[in-house]
Swiss-Prot record:
This is Transcription factor AP-2 gamma. The modification Phosphoserine is found at S252, S434. Binds DNA as a dimer. Can form homodimers or heterodimers with other AP-2 family members. Interacts with WWOX. Interacts with UBE2I. Interacts with KCTD1; this interaction represses transcription activation. Interacts with CITED2 (via C-terminus); the interaction stimulates TFAP2B-transcriptional activity. Interacts with CITED4. Interacts with MTA1. There is a cross-link at K10 (Glycyl lysine isopeptide (Lys-Gly) (interchain with G-Cter in SUMO)). Sequence-specific DNA-binding transcription factor that interacts with cellular enhancer elements to regulate transcription of selected genes, and which plays a key role in early embryonic development. AP-2 factors bind to the consensus sequence 5'-GCCNNNGGC-3' and activate genes involved in a large spectrum of important biological functions. TFAP2C plays a key role in early embryonic development by regulating both inner cell mass (ICM) and trophectoderm differentiation. At the 8-cell stage, during morula development, controls expression of cell-polarity genes. One of its GO terms (cellular component) is chromatin. One of its GO terms (biological process) is forebrain neuron fate commitment. It comes from Homo sapiens. InterPro entries: TF_AP2, TF_AP2_C, TF_AP2_gamma. Changing Y59A: Loss of interaction with WWOX. Residues 440-450 have a biased composition (Basic and acidic residues). It comes from the Eukaryota. Sumoylated on Lys-10; which inhibits transcriptional activity. The gene is TFAP2C. Residues 13-63, 90-126, 431-450 are annotated as: Disordered.
Amino acid sequence: MLWKITDNVKYEEDCEDRHDGSSNGNPRVPHLSSAGQHLYSPAPPLSHTGVAEYQPPPYFPPPYQQLAYSQSADPYSHLGEAYAAAINPLHQPAPTGSQQQAWPGRQSQEGAGLPSHHGRPAGLLPHLSGLEAGAVSARRDAYRRSDLLLPHAHALDAAGLAENLGLHDMPHQMDEVQNVDDQHLLLHDQTVIRKGPISMTKNPLNLPCQKELVGAVMNPTEVFCSVPGRLSLLSSTSKYKVTVAEVQRRLSPPECLNASLLGGVLRRAKSKNGGRSLREKLDKIGLNLPAGRRKAAHVTLLTSLVEGEAVHLARDFAYVCEAEFPSKPVAEYLTRPHLGGRNEMAARKNMLLAAQQLCKEFTELLSQDRTPHGTSRLAPVLETNIQNCLSHFSLITHGFGSQAICAAVSALQNYIKEALIVIDKSYMNPGDQSPADSNKTLEKMEKHRK
């Protein structure tokens, strides 16, 4: 169009020159001023008999794929198109490949905001700037029609954006992560549960969503391995089954065994990669044993015992205390100095009865301890604070401590019973009997009993 206007201007100048030559040299200044006015006017189009009015070429939109989500109203429809484009640039569609190939000149001109003058004479640039500005603005208005934009350009709402980016499943995935984490908080001995990054099956964006998860530990009653006893003779060696729950207790407070100590407890042979193989085996059942871990409790001889052997030792100790402890001789020996008179014997008897009551209360408390051992897991009956204290002691001794104390207190109760018997027999004797005669009487009663 601009070249046609330039040709028309040159044609008019040639006609004026010819007319001046044939009209006795009188210049036609009004005609030139009108031509200059048409030439330098920035916006109005030139009306010439030989030039038709400019019309933009027809636009054929490229084929595009219809999206599944619906459109929403443009939130900036009440503003002008120029202001709407400046406020919300996301609502403007990205040009496709076909549009870039079809209109390279228009994109370069609109992107820079200035007309392109490549190939034009340098002298015409000041004269044609106004005409080209008007033409560019007309073309911009023509191509900014709403029907030329993609159907989803004005409706890139939150739902569509979430579906395009693959974020529609993220709330459900984070809920699942939160539920798993809540379950982890309810488990006992959290420190040994396997922890690692969550491997989400529905993660289209490959986001590094990581939280501490509890892959539920395998069946706690499942046997992890069998361990030969340390205290048994070679002729009667017995093996004790170590369950998954027991391994979890040994890795948890208060002991917090490391790989070296746990390998010794489980009687694993020392090797170059023994710690790594043990950690891999524990990882398969859902337990975590970090490398370089430090033990929390002081190592004793009881540390080397598994729970089965420790409980076995406590039972044997209780049997020996019940069957072999000399309760009667000890009671007779300690009661002799207090048989001088009825008042002294009565005071001694009251002391023994009080001690017997204390031992009974103490034994009943220890018998209500519900610390899990082996495959047993009973419901607690004591208050939480006292049960936690008893569990700490029982876990340190692997079940041996409470049962051993009960056996020792039972031996003490047997002594008290025998002492009360001696006092009762001495109290029934005549008061004029001397302590020596009382001793002789006790000896005769002992011989008669045998």
